[in-house]
Every structure is written in C-alpha cells, then in structure tokens.
C-alpha cells in the first residue's frame, strides 16, 4: 500500500508539473497576434537646456562656453524652433534620450517640462517619453550665472525624486504600465519605466546613469559621465521585454548611454559613452526580443548594429545633440503589417538638420540675432584654441598618468605653458590655408554628422598621410618640448628621450586608428537615413536611385510590385545640390515596381527642399507631380503613385471598338492613404511610349466604357505621349476630328461612334456634330451596328437608287422591318430624321434583333407629350424608358421635341446609350 501511495504521489506530482509547465509556457509560445502599426516618432537627444534667466554676460559664463561646444546662449531659441518642427510634423510619439538640461538645474528641468507639456497640448494624441542623462541628476556643475555680482552660484540640483515629480506627466501617463523599483537602500536605475503607447509597441526607458553611492566609482551620491546597468535592472528589462514579446509587441529601448559601439575605437578611448558590459547586455536584450534602442550621449548621429549568436540583430540608433553640430532631429516612420501570415515590420529613420532661420535674442546682452542655417552656424563651434586651453590641463595629467606613470615631471612645465603650446600645435600646417585644428574639426564633425564615409577632401587625405607617416606626431612633440622647456635645453632633450620609438609607434598607431575609425563607418554607414527591416525578409529592403541635378539613393521596402520609400530632406538636398527648382526622379525600375508609395513626410520634404517636380520612373513610363500637385497634397500622409499597363472590361473593349487592338493602354493613379486625391488639373502627368500615328489623343475610359478626353501631347523626339493622370484606364488612340471639343457633352459618343465605325467623318478632320442626321444616315449607322450584312432581297423604294452608299443599308432595313418608308413606295433618304422617327426606327431595330423592348415610360410629365404622333407614342415611351431619349432643354424647359430634327451628335449619343443599355444590357 505504501508503494502504491508513493507511486501515486509521483504520478500526481508529474501531472501537476506538466500542467504547471504547460500553463506557464503556452502564453509565451502562443504570443498574441502582432498588431499592425503606422506610427511617426520624433527623436531628440542632449537638449542641454539652460534657461535664459540663468545666463549673464560674465567671466564665469564665458568660461563655461569655452569649456564646451554647446550653443548655450542660443539654446532656448533653438529648442523653440525644433519644437516648431515637431509640431509641423505631428508625430505620434516624441522620445528624448537624456541630458535634458545643461547640468541638472532643477529650474531648467521645470521650464523644459512645461515646454514639453505645451507641445503635447498642441499635438493631439502626442505621447512624450523622456529619460535622464548623465548631466541631469545630482550634478555639482549646476549653476546660475545670472547673479547680482556676476559670480556663478550653485543652482538647485535635481535628485531622482525631483525628476519623477517634474516629469510626472510622463511617469503618470496611462500608457506607462510598469516602473522599476531598485532593491531596498539602492537608487540605481530607479527612473526606468515601461510604456505601451499603442497595441503592438512597448517602449522600455532605461535609467543607465550613475548618481547613487552603490553605483558610482567613488561610492558617492554624485553624477558620473559613464553609464551602468545594475544586475537587477538588467533582469527587469529582460523580463519586461519577454512579456512584451509574449503579447505580440515590438520592443524599443530608450536610454542615454550606448549599447553598441559607434566607431571601432570607442570602447578604447571613450568607454564612458557605453554602458558597462555593453556587449553581453546588448546580446541578452536582443535575444529577449528588443530590436532597437535609441541613445544619445556622444552628440553624434550614428546607427550601429550587432547580431547575436542566435541570429537576432540589435540596432543602437544614436541621435546627436540639439545644441551641437549638426543639431539634428530624427524622424522615424514605424510600419508593421501582417501579409499572408508573415509579419513585416520596418523602421525608416531620417534626420532633419539645417534648421532655420532662427531668431534669437542673446540672454546675456539683449542683442537680436538671426541664424539662417543652424547646422552651418554650429559648424563654427567646433574645437577652438580657447576651448582646448580650458580642458587641456586635465588631459595632460591623464596622458602622463596612463602612458608615462613613472615620468610625470614634465606635467608642471607643460601645464604652465599650455596656452602657447595649444596655439602652436593648432597652427601646424596641413596644406596652405588648412591647419591641424581644421583637420581635427573635420574628422570630428564628419563623425558627429554621420558623414563618416571615407570620402576625404584632398587636404584631409594629405593630413591622414602625414599622420600615418609619423610626421605630424613629431611636429607636435617638438612644439611641446620647445614651448615647455626651451629648444636646446637639457629638459628639452630629456623630454624627447621619454618618447621612445616604441612609444611613439604606439601613440601614432592609436592616433591613426582614432582618425580612421571616426571617419570611416564600417557598421551601418547610412547613419542619417536608413530603412531597417525588423521583422520579415531582408531581401525586401532595396536601394532606389534618386536623381536631380545630382544623384543620391533612397532605401525602399519592397513587397511584391510595391516599393515604399521615405524621401528625406538629406536625400533631396543631395539630389538637388541643395538648390531649389530641380526635378527629382525616383527610379523604380530595378527592382521593378508598378506602385511607389512616397511615405511618411516625403511630400513635405520635397516641398521644403524646393523641389519643382517629383517624378517616379516606372518600367511602363513616368508619373510626374509638379509643384502645384506637391502644394495640394497632404504633407503628412502616404502618397501612392502607380503606373501599369491595363486590361479592359467588356464595356471598355466595346468603347474602343476597332482601336482596342492598337491603342496604348495605361493605368496611372495618385492616391493618398488609399483614396483618390484632388489636385490642380494638369499638375500630375504620366508619360508612356506610344505608337506613332497622326491625331493621337488620350482618353479616360470608365468601367462602363464611357469615354472622356484627357489633356495630353505627343513627343515625336521621345516617342512618348504625356497625359494628365486621371482615375481608371487611359487609352492613347487616334481621333482625327478637330470639331469635337474635349469637354463637350457628346465627345465620348462621337469617339464611340468613330471607334466602332458607325459614323464616317464629313471630312478627314471633321465630324460635323451639329449637322442634321438624314434618314439614310441613321439606317446606315444601324446597318453597320448589325455588322453590315448583305441584303437578301432587292430594293423596293423608288427614291433609293442602286449603288449608293446607303442602298444596301436601306434594303436590309426594309426587309427586316426596321423601316417601312413614308408611303407611296418612297423612303425619303435625304430627309432629316426627326426625334420620334429615330425612336421608331430604333424600336424596330431592337425588336428585329430580339432585344427586350418591353420597358415603357410615362411621358405625361413632358409639356409637349401631346404633340407626339400616334404612330410614335409607343416607341418613344420605350426609348425614354431605355434611357435613349431623355428630352432636350428648350426655353428653360425639358421637352421631347418629337418633330425636331436629330443632329449627328445627338444620334451618336443615342446610339452609345443604345449599345450599352439595350444591345449589351
């Protein structure tokens, strides 16, 4: 019994374990269906906001400016203009990846928070998520420079609880679904949180900053530049990521410090810009399901990626500072859709720079200024001798401590003469007109701007060659020795002796690696504009040429025959050489696409770049949107441009008649978010190869076969026909009649009659629409409509001579009961046919062909109904019911006018209706 009980307990335990495992694992294995998304995200970083109220024209503030490259004086106005850009862009989400303030001044946090809240009020539905940077919390550098005596005083420092309180509109937002709580007694990571702004997207904001004693290198509650993620925060992030993936969400991270190096030697020379243990943590985050992290800190525009052993790719998208060159704002279009059971998610990143004009009043002096181009303005605030003199002393001490720890005796002399040394080193010539300071700024700024593509100007290449040869380092060391110790002195010689060939080789190799690493991006070189496929086949991301007066490329997300592109300001500036008035062409012929979606803010960017016309090149031809169309289209919606061949409905086939086999057919369209868009006539035109012929014209064919004229012209040199884009099928065909106006009520009927051989022209180029129709003409038209059959008998009308153009038609009509003449053996072929005669002849024709003629209409509403001849009443009632004769307007009234004559235009329209409503009903 005991054995049986023991085995039963084991079995029960096993069953319980299976149930427990199944219960815990099924939610993770059976993740919710991924939600479709179409989101616009604005990304800013390192705002370093310093309130104008805390700025004064003092020596202390000047010292602060010389210690940095930030546009602190202009900062308030710069942010105002950037927020204006965000308002115009109308994003769904704004992310700010840390360093919100200059140095964590609580007054600045409070002011910035109000500005962000106002931005949120101005953009309905906007969600804002911020995270702190190393400058923002417990920063002893927080100062107020605007004091009565001109001496800077400490500003109110911001503590973690202050940050949460000030940005309560973020932390208390209903979309914030979790916050991180550190272990008792700890604070590290305590500002981290999770937000779910929409179904399908989870954002994990991670506090990677060091400001509490358990997380700082010296054990104090004081900020440090470097970043760290504690073990408990790391575990929490992984758990939150896994939970988000289980509910089918895409997971995006937000933090200040980097998780992937942005240039090769960053871990060596600037490790404080990466989170500690970044390699392991990035792999764990990626394998847990996080796809992207938005970072800042380095003030550079860069995208870097790494792939784990499990095959998961992780992107670190770094955004530069708003207040240092190139002063960027990122805009991200996030698209997710499930097609055929496959989830496809892609993110298109674009970078907006060259903001301007910016009007600002210098807080310190009250003088007014205008910044025409913020990026070019900030370019001038690179490394300067004043800035280098301010920070060089600490660098010298650090250098000797690292490379010559046993020979620190030169430090005092070097620091004492640092100003002269800096001036002389900066002035080392590279080529005529360019010195070493220019060289350093070029290398650094190309990295900051994400322009580190290895395309060096000749003078920069010369500097690199001199650096690689060791010549530059020799010059620098000689200058230091001369300025610090005096040329030829004992200390001069002793100093030079410190730098052995081995040490100089080490230093030179390091300098070369730094320069090359910062100017040649070997990891995701498309730092400013990149389409990233997060879920789906990588083969779906392709490059499309963009050409204007110059050339560029754009990335396209290709699904079948549709290519989605995000034209960025940067690409358009490159394609137009930053000059307005150019036509820019997007080439969609390789891969072949018949629809190009100009997504995100492509239209807005084209307008802001001064593009005169935006053209899409398809295999079938081109579609061009001119400036009027660009001005009319919605700036914030996707515009789909399409050009394909076309297949015809049966009604369209009949409308083209004999020309169906020879006409050039196309289907062109411009739609906005899937719906037809209105734009000025003639502002959107397509060009397609067409067969050369006289009197070519463009027709729009409705599904029911109705023909209308489309503006267009033949280009004999290009052998193309250019026409206005309208909805539906466009046919390029021959139509020789110059007396049929394009907008006339009978245009389509005349074209139908011509295409089907029902009417001949009165001359090679005239239709004579207002000429009266004779009885012979009408009968001949019906005979042709029947296929021009040979009559079986002989003509019996005395006034219809043999051998005329209408003899066979009249003979056929008489023997088939279509006409019976006017009496006395006569037909009166040349008499004008009246409207009621037309109705009778059509009725007889329909009856003889076996068509349904049972419909009847009440004609009593027509004021002249009583004037209808008795022999015509039944036929006219049928013709009205069938939609053939609907009355004519005369003297402001609609009348039947039964005895009135019928013009060629009227009969053509009646026959078009007859063919569709009776013959093909």
PLM regions: where:
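Sec-dependent signal peptide cleavage junction
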Residues: 22-33
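N-terminal active-site segment of His-dependent metallophosphoesterases
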Residues: 31-109
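Non-catalytic terminal accessory segments
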Residues: 31-33, 358-547
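His/acidic metal-ligating clusters that form di-metal
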Residues: 34, 90, 202-205, 216-313, ...
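Extended active-site neighborhood of metal-dependent phosphoesterases/phosphodiesterases
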Residues: 111-235, 310, 331
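Proteolytic cleavage junctions
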Residues: 546-551, 556, 662, 667-755
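Proteolytic processing hotspots in large secreted/extracellular or virion-associated proteins
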Residues: 564-703
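Feature responds to low-complexity, polar/acidic, surface-exposed segments characteristic
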Residues: 711, 717, 722-747, 755-756, ...
């Amino acid at each position: 019994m005991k054995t049986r009980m023991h085995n039963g307990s084991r079995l029960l335990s096993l069953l319980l374990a299976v149930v427990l495992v199944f219960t815990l694992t099924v939610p993770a294995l059976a993740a919710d269906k991924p939600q479709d998304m179409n989101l616009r995200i604005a990304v800013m970083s390192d705002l370093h906001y310093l309130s104008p109220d805390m700025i004064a024209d003092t020596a202390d503030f000047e010292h602060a400016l010389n210690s940095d490259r930030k546009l602190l004086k202009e900062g308030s106005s710069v942010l105002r203009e950037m927020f204006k850009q965000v308002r115009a862009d109308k994003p769904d989400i704004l992310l700010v990846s840390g360093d919100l303030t200059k140095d964590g001044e609580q007054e600045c946090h409070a002011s910035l928070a109000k500005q962000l809240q106002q931005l949120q009020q101005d953009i309905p539905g906007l969600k804002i998520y911020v995270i702190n940077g190393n400058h923002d919390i417990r920063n002893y550098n927080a100062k107020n420079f605007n004091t009565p005596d001109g001496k800077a005083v400490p500003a109110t420092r911001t503590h973690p609880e202050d940050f949460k309180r000030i940005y309560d509109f973020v932390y208390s937002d209903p979309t914030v679904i979790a916050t991180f709580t550190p272990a008792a007694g700890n604070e590290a990571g305590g500002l981290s949180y999770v937000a779910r702004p929409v179904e399908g997207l989870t954002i994990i904001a991670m506090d990677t900053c060091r400001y509490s004693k358990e997380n700082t290198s010296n054990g104090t509650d004081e900020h440090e530049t470097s970043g760290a993620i504690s073990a408990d925060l790391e575990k929490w992030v992984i758990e939150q990521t896994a939970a988000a993936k289980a509910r089918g969400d895409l997971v995006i991270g937000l933090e200040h410090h980097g998780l992937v190096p942005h240039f090769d030697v960053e871990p060596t020379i600037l490790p404080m810009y990466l989170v500690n243990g970044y390699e392991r943590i990035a792999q764990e985050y990626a394998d847990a399901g996080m796809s992207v992290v938005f970072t800042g800190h380095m003030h550079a525009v860069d995208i870097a990626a790494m792939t784990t052993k499990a095959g998961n790719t992780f992107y670190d998208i770094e955004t530069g500072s708003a207040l240092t060159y190139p002063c960027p704002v990122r805009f991200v279009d996030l698209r997710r859709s499930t097609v055929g059971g496959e989830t496809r998610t892609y993110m298109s990143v674009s970078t907006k720079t060259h903001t301007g004009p910016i009007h600002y009043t210098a807080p310190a002096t009250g003088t007014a200024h205008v910044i025409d181009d913020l990026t070019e303005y900030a370019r001038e605030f690179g490394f300067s001798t004043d800035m280098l003199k301010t920070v060089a002393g600490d660098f010298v001490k650090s250098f000797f401590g690292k490379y010559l720890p046993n020979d620190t005796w030169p430090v005092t002399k070097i620091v004492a003469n640092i100003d002269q040394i800096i001036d002389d080193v900066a002035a080392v010539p590279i080529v005529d007109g360019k010195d070493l300071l220019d060289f350093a700024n070029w290398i650094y700024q190309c990295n900051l701007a994400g322009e580190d593509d290895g395309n060096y100007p000749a003078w920069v290449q010369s500097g690199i060659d001199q650096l690689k040869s060791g010549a530059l380092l020799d010059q620098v060391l000689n200058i230091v020795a001369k300025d610090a110790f005096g040329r030829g002195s004992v200390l001069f010689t002793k100093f030079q002796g410190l730098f052995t060939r081995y040490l100089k080789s080490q230093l030179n190799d390091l300098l070369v690696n730094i320069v090359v690493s910062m100017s040649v991006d070997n990891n995701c070189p498309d730092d400013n504009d990149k389409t990233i496929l997060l879920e789906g086949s990588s083969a779906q991301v392709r490059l499309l040429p963009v050409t204007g007066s110059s050339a560029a490329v754009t990335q396209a997300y290709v699904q079948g025959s549709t290519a989605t592109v995000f034209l960025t300001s940067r690409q358009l500036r490159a394609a137009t050489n930053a000059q307005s008035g150019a036509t820019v062409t997007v080439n969609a012929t390789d891969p072949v696409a018949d629809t190009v979606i100009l997504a995100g803010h492509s239209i807005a960017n084209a307008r802001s770049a001064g593009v005169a016309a935006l053209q899409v090149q398809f295999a079938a031809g081109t579609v061009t949107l001119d400036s009027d169309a660009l001005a009319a289209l919605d700036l914030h919606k996707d515009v789909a441009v399409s050009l394909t061949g076309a297949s015809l409905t049966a009604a369209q086939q009949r409308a083209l008649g004999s020309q169906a086999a020879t006409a050039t057919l196309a289907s062109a369209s411009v739609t906005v978010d899937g719906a037809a868009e209105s734009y000025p006539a003639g502002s959107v035109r397509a060009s397609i190869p067409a067969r050369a012929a006289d009197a070519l014209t463009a027709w729009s064919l409705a599904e029911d076969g109705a023909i209308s004229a489309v503006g267009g012209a033949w280009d004999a040199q290009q052998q193309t026909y250019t026409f206005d884009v309208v909805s539906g099928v466009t046919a390029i065909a021959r139509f020789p009649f110059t007396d049929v106006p394009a907008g006339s009520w009978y245009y389509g009927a005349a074209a139908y009659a011509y295409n089907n051989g029902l009417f001949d022209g009165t001359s090679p180029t005239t239709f004579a629409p207002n000429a009266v129709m004779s009885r012979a003409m009408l009968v001949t038209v019906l005979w042709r409509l029947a296929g021009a059959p040979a009559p079986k008998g002989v003509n019996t009308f005395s006034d219809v001579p043999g051998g005329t153009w209408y003899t066979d038609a009249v003979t056929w009509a008489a023997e088939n009961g279509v006409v019976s003449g006017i009496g006395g053996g006569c037909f009166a072929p040349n008499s004008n046919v009246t409207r009621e005669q037309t109705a009778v002849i059509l009725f007889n024709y329909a009856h003889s062909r076996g068509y349904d003629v049972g419909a009847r209409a009440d004609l009593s509403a027509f004021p002249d109904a009583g004037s209808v001849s008795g022999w015509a009443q039944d036929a006219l009632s049928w013709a009205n019911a069938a939609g053939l004769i609907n009355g004519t307007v005369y003297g402001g009234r609609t009348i039947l006018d039964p005895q009135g004559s019928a013009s060629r235009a009227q009969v053509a329209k009646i026959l078009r209706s007859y063919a569709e409503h009776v013959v093909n009903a």
